[in-house]
Each structure stands twice: as C-alpha cells, then as structure tokens.
Amino acid sequence: MKKKVLTLTVSKQWFDMIVAGEKKEEYREIKPYWVARLFQNNSNIVDVQSLASCLAGRTDLLKGYIDANRIVLKPYTHVLFINGYRKDCPRIEKEIDSITIGKPKKGLCPDKWLDTEFFIIKFK
C-alpha cells in the first residue's frame, strides 16, 4: 500500500505525550472540515463536501453513511504530528492503526470533551 500521510498540528502538551508514548490516539471534532478531510465518496450518489455540511452535529447519520459504505475513509497510512507552524517546528510521524468515532479517554484530552463524540485517530 502506498504511504499516505495525514498532517495534524497539536499543542506542546499533547505532542510531548505522543513522543513519550503516553498518548496513542488523537481527537478531531466531527465537523464538516474533518468529514471532508478524512472521508471520500464511495458512490456517485453522495458528495462528501455537501454531506459534510448537512451532517454537522449528527453523528448518528454520519455513522449510517459509514456503515452503509456510502462514504469511506481516505487511505491514510501515517499521521504526522507537528507542534507549531514554523518550518523547523518539532514533528513526529506515527503509523495509523484506525480511525473511528467515539468518546475520548480521560487524561488524553481536555476534561470538557469527555462526554462528546469525536473522530479518534489511533496510532502505533
């Protein structure tokens, strides 16, 4: 399989935990931007860009489209974590294990997120 990298910017706190091996998953909000960034069309019926706007806040509908195989994850194989926006900022690349929808784990995100569903990017 050809290597395809998903690039994510993270704060120093989470970056340091990833480097230390203490954090094995990263979270992204279920918003139109991330639906369009993580998924691709699997039929001529669904336009991912339009669908992303319609599904804002509707994880039940999004899961239905995924379960019906109408949209599929883009074939990302690795995630590149970057701490900052400069050219010389710290970075680390990890192999992606899976991308799912679920609730985050305590200690791996701000506590206010614990009761909310997110895209969970699990890595090795």
Set out the residue ranges of the language-model regions:
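Structured alpha/beta reader/binder surfaces that contact nucleic acids or chromatin modification marks
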Residues: 3-124
